[in-house]
Amino acid sequence: MYFRSRFGKTVNNAWLPDVFGNSWILPQILKKSGVEYFVSNKMSTWNDTNRFPHNNFIWRGIDGTDVYACVPPTHFITWNMPSQIQENWEAYQDKESGGQTLSMFGYGDGGSCATEEMIELMHRFDKLSVMPKTEQTGGTSFLEKNLKGNENLAVWDGELY
């Protein structure tokens, strides 16, 4: 309701990129709030004990409620360098079932964003045959294209940590 009243947009996705663990009750809360998609990040980048086995998947809550979920394979603060894009693709665990991988870039901590140089790099990647194919898109578009209706997604039934 807040985004609709302030910006004229209905938001159907929740992003908690800088959280180390997410409670098993969250899918139920998200779904009851009109949220279909969930994105978090720390499980794939900061957990040195248990490697989370999926990047694009369905997260099933404690009551059986499902939401689509994305845990990008690399950190949410990158400079969009070719080596970082390559690392993101190589670390992506759902190549066969999850559609594309999400790579976020920019100076995320402190409220900053992508620079002109980072965006220019994105435009140059298509000209490099050794680079994974990239596409610049918005979060909602990415989630809908790669998760919604994807019957090949794994189901994670439990907490995210």
Predicted regions and their residues:
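Catalytic-domain carbohydrate-binding cleft regions of carbohydrate-active enzymes
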Residues: M1-Y161
